[in-house]
């Protein structure tokens, strides 16, 4: 039974986001690592993200029944009841908020809660009503590195805004790739993603534009002397690779396979850049 509750929290999403939390935390630390603060930030935000995912499962319940990839989720198959999920989600949110309030700072808690509100009350509810759901979701998804950064700095400065913008622009091609790859599922659930509303070709062009913007935005960390040349080289190299993969998609005969490759590479690029940041800081 514990495993089903764990599945409700979408642990894969949490772990992926914690990599970017680490990047933000270490960028702001500038070599002065505080283990206790790092642990508290990771733990507190993990609880809040887990809560958001539980409520997302609850809100998406009827849609999840219609999509093949979500038909075996705990709420769908009935191993966990809706009221139990709500109580579980509330408990996670409270614990996470307590940890961040007492062991980090108020700004960090406020940013984390804003991310939670955007994800649960805006993205989860509106993604089935508007094609702009992806853009709304990208705002929530850009919060984790900001939380890591502000836990150390306790302020919103240029570094924080660059990190936030990076994640917003990364998530757009990331989500659009998923939308193309899982197009049949989204169609079955009547979720108005861009490929369904505007067509796959227009979505591919949007992907290319966002990859360019993401690469340029990511490079700003070096231009403003937060990171060194290694980070810049990797940013440009991986960004160009991603862009070339995207260009090949304009003529591909297998959109689903191409979109899956784009999705996987999006995970590679954000992971590599996040892990490079702490090793190439400019003090």
From Swiss-Prot:
Signal peptide: none annotated. It is found in: Cell inner membrane. InterPro entries: Protohaem_IX_farnesylTrfase (IPR006369), UbiA_prenyltransferase (IPR000537), UbiA_sf (IPR044878). It is a multi-pass membrane protein. It comes from the Bacteria. Its EC number is 2.5.1.141. It catalyses: heme b + (2E,6E)-farnesyl diphosphate + H2O = Fe(II)-heme o + diphosphate. Pathway: Porphyrin-containing compound metabolism; heme O biosynthesis; heme O from protoheme: step 1/1. One of its GO terms (biological process) is heme O biosynthetic process. GO terms for molecular function: protoheme IX farnesyltransferase activity. Keywords: Cell inner membrane, Cell membrane, Heme biosynthesis, Membrane, Transferase, Transmembrane, Transmembrane helix. One of its GO terms (cellular component) is plasma membrane. The chain crosses the membrane at residues 6-26, 35-55, 85-105, 106-126, 131-151, 160-180, 207-227, 230-250, 262-282. Belongs to the UbiA prenyltransferase family. Protoheme IX farnesyltransferase subfamily. This is Protoheme IX farnesyltransferase. It comes from Protochlamydia amoebophila (strain UWE25).
């Amino acid at each position: 039974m514990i495993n089903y509750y764990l599945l409700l929290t979408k642990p894969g999403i949490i772990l992926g986001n914690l990599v970017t939390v680490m990047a933000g935390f270490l960028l702001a630390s500038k070599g002065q690592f505080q283990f206790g603060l790092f642990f508290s930030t990771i733990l507190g935000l993990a609880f809040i993200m887990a809560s958001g995912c539980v409520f997302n499962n609850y809100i998406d319940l009827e849609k999840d029944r219609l999509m093949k990839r979500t038909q075996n989720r705990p709420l769908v198959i009935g191993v966990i009841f809706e009221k139990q999920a709500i109580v579980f989600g509330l408990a996670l949110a409270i614990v996470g908020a307590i940890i961040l309030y007492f062991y980090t700072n108020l700004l960090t808690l406020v940013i984390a809660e804003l991310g939670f509100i955007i994800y649960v009350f805006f993205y989860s509810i509106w993604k089935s009503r508007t094609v702009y759901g992806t853009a709304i979701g990208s705002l929530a998804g850009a919060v984790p590195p900001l939380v890591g950064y502000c836990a150390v700095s306790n302020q919103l400065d240029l570094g924080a805004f660059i990190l936030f913008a990076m994640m917003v622009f990364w998530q757009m091609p990331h989500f659009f790739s998923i939308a193309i790859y899982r197009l049949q599922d989204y169609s079955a659930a009547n979720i108005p993603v861009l490929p369904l509303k505007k067509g796959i070709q227009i979505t591919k062009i949007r992907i290319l534009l966002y990859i360019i913007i993401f690469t340029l935005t990511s490079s700003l960390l070096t231009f403003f002397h937060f990171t060194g040349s290694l980070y810049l080289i990797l940013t440009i190299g991986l960004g160009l690779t991603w862009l070339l993969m995207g260009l090949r998609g304009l003529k591909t005969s297998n959109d689903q396979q191409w979109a899956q490759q784009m999705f996987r590479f999006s995970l590679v690029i954000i992971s590599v850049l996040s892990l490079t940041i702490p090793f190439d800081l400019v003090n």
